[in-house]
């Protein structure tokens, strides 16, 4: 009979150490669970042969008392926009349906070197352009908290890293990689009731992450607990010669005390007034207020702060996003890279038809909009101005962090909406709502973490977001760990 797997990485590692569980049997259970939960559509593909081969090696290391790390033998998942050697990497798009990389993304490679076991590649919005994981060529992903097999209307998982969030929430994986351009890790983490973390830009290598918006893309981490998130972060952070945007200084792993020993006395918590916005649900507002009160009762001081350019941020983000998308998508021409049409009348027609077949409407619209903003007559009016306002948004954060140590905000404006409701609005309008609270952190390059707090009246997760100054990850994790211990979120783990 299968032994129920533990909830946390530390517990799993201890089971391996005492040999009450071994990596092979744990992996077999995980693969069985993934098979039972196929209706969630969290995975584009699983890799059972690779996973079991990795588990055999991990089992040998544990038996000899030489595990590589806390992650040795832990099942993980990787979003399908990170390159994995010998395994299809599709970005959930027809354009890359048959793409098999010859190398690994740095962040996955570092996890593998720490002994983590790859269960499979997770579903996403095409190229990461979405906030629901609803437009993949492999079909939408269903939120684990409210999914009934065969039911056509379900709660969305959030996006674009929805598959990774569901893989973690359902217990298939202990951790998963996502990407975060405007909230694509934190948004699904919020809806699925898991921890979602976006680090300071440059602390995690983007090598092998198929680019969407180079100036904002960062790898993200999804786990069930703050400690697990920190363990993964410690394993993959640090400079990478293959990515010139990584910080060149040595990364010192972060350690935290037990939650009971964390003291918040003297901590200054900022509450941005602009985040009390249109569409914010009463339940999220109440949760936000209660956690602020909880922090104050623990000795922290809570202060209203202003981030004046918040209202402009979503529009500036949209312009810059589309401009960089137009540039990045130019490489997919059907000649050297990506889907190739059967058209052979001319090179121009081959190029046009390959792109028409390989991209969905969302991608095409962003390419067209981006190229419009980049036209010579529009460049100064849109792109240059957007860059200037982005600097003002970053300055907002700089000023706020001169007054406070950390910011507390909603992650999403409500609990997870139904699929039928979500698709009533087009992708652009949905992103304007779904990314409102999350994309400013990408614009400023600062670290941010989404933490599940409680369940709504619909028995769905409600989460809040913490943001900290650049390179203040330790402070972020410390406060998150303290809150986690106080709220004791009710998990729905298998």
UniProtKB/Swiss-Prot annotation:
It is an enzyme of class 6 (ligase). It comes from the Eukaryota. The keyword Endoplasmic reticulum does not apply. GO terms for molecular function: ATP binding; glutaminyl-tRNA synthase (glutamine-hydrolyzing) activity. InterPro entries: Amidase, Amidase_dom, AS_sf, GatA. It is found in: Mitochondrion. Allows the formation of correctly charged Gln-tRNA(Gln) through the transamidation of misacylated Glu-tRNA(Gln) in the mitochondria. The reaction takes place in the presence of glutamine and ATP through an activated gamma-phospho-Glu-tRNA(Gln). Belongs to the amidase family. GatA subfamily. This is Glutamyl-tRNA(Gln) amidotransferase subunit A, mitochondrial. The lineage of its organism: Eukaryota, Metazoa, Ecdysozoa, Arthropoda, Hexapoda.
């Amino acid at each position: 009979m299968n032994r129920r797997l533990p909830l946390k990485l530390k517990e799993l590692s201890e089971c391996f150490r005492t040999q009450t569980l071994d990596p092979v049997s744990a992996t077999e259970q995980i693969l069985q669970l993934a098979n039972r939960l196929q209706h969630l559509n969290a995975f584009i593909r699983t890799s059972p042969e690779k996973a079991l081969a990795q588990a055999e090696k991990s089992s040998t290391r544990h038996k000899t008392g030489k595990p590589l790390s806390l992650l040795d033998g832990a099942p993980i998942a990787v979003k399908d926009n990170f390159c994995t050697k010998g395994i299809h990497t599709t970005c959930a798009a027809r354009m890359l349906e048959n793409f098999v990389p010859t190398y690994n993304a740095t962040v996955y490679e570092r996890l593998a070197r720490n002994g983590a076991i790859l269960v499979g590649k997770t579903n996403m919005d095409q190229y990461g352009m979405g906030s629901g994981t609803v437009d993949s060529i492999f079909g939408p992903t269903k939120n684990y908290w409210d999914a009934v097999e065969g039911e056509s209307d379900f709660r969305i998982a959030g996006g674009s890293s929805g598959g990774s969030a569901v893989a973690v929430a359902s217990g298939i994986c202990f951790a998963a990689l996502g990407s975060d351009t405007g909230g694509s890790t934190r948004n699904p983490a919020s809806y699925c009731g898991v921890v979602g973390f976006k680090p300071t830009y440059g602390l995690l290598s983007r090598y092998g992450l198929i680019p969407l918006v180079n100036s904002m893309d960062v790898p993200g981490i999804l786990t069930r607990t703050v400690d697990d998130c920190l363990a993964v972060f410690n394993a993959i952070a640090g400079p990478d010669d293959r990515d010139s945007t990584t910080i060149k200084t040595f990364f010192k792993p972060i350690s935290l005390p037990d939650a009971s020993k964390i003291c918040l006395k003297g901590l200054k918590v900022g509450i941005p007034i602009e985040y009390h916005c249109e569409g914010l649900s009463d339940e999220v507002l109440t949760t936000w207020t209660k956690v602020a009160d909880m922090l104050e009762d623990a000795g922290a001081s809570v202060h209203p702060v202003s981030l004046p350019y918040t209202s402009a941020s979503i529009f500036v983000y949209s312009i810059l996003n589309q401009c960089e998308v137009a540039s990045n998508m130019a490489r997919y021409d059907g000649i050297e890279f990506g889907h190739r049409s059967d058209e052979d009348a001319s090179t121009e027609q081959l190029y046009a038809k390959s792109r028409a077949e390989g991209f969905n409407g969302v991608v095409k619209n962003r390419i067209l909009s981006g190229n419009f903003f980049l036209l010579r007559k529009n460049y100064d009016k849109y792109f240059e101005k957007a860059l200037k306002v982005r600097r003002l948004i970053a300055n907002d954060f700089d000023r706020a962090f001169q007054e406070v140590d950390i910011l507390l905000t909603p992650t999403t404006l409500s609990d997870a909406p139904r699929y039928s409701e979500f698709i009533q609005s087009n992708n652009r309008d949905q992103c304007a709502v779904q990314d409102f609270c999350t994309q400013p952190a990408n614009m400023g390059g600062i670290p941010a973490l989404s933490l599940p707090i409680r369940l709504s009246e619909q028995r769905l997760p409600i989460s809040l977001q913490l943001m900290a100054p650049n390179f203040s990850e330790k402070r972020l994790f410390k406060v998150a760990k303290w809150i986690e211990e106080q709220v004791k979120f009710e998990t729905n783990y298998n």
